């Protein structure tokens, strides 16, 4: 994903300027990568209610348990709110309470498949 612009820039006033602007952001095919975003809603099996943050089966316990697979916690006021891995992946909490794997930039779909399967076996 490209970084957001740091200034408003000059307004585009022709089709050619638009084409040149888009072309300037293109990477050569050798640098192309794909990444996975995989969201999971965490809920309690017996009540089907969303899992709380605290508790034996809560989001905090899930994030802390995943650390045994090499995930490093991202803390806010001492509480884990995300995880990062040396391989370029991260696990984040989304606004709706879901847990998201943001995969590493990989070369092909078979690598993303392996990444998701590994993640799901850890969860």
Question: Which residues fall in each region the model found?
Answer:
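Terminal catalytic/cofactor-binding subdomain
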Residues: 1-123
